[in-house]
């Protein structure tokens, strides 16, 4: 435990050193992100929605990158952040399917457990919302034509995950989850 605390403290020190290179707004957001990062591990004990909290936490970097570049927060970045949250909610629910039995035994909560009878539908809704939000954002901001190929590939990767995903087969769940490396790259 002592070594882990030293390691975590070292990482926090280096992260803070990097953070102070940015503008004041980004620094404030970076410090605020610490609440999310430290609270996330406890969410599985508190709520069936830790994947939503992961989405809020993991995608906070989108807002920070925007503020680092523009020194402002705008509707566009909040919309992109929201789309990424739904995407994370979907893919982490797929990942969590592999752990349902063990999580139920030890009393850990997740969206995978909450929606286990309708998991494919829940993930589909999450991905659908992410796609609709992204299409709306890109069409409004850039004109859909500029991003048609990338958005189409992203959409197809999410649809492929839904097709590949089988809650009764851990290997298929992991394969579907790993597709998100490609989806995120897009």
List each model region and its residues.
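Multi-pass membrane catalytic core of lipid/isoprenoid biosynthesis enzymes
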Residues: 1-30, 86, 105-147
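Interhelical loop and helix-boundary elements at the membrane-water interface
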Residues: 1-7, 38-57, 103-124, 162-186
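Intramembrane alpha-helical segments
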Residues: 2-79, 136, 157-167
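Alpha-helical transmembrane segments
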Residues: 75-87, 143-150
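Membrane-embedded alpha-helices of multi-pass transport/permease systems
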Residues: 89-108
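Extended hydrophobic alpha-helices typical of membrane-associated regions
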Residues: 132, 136-186
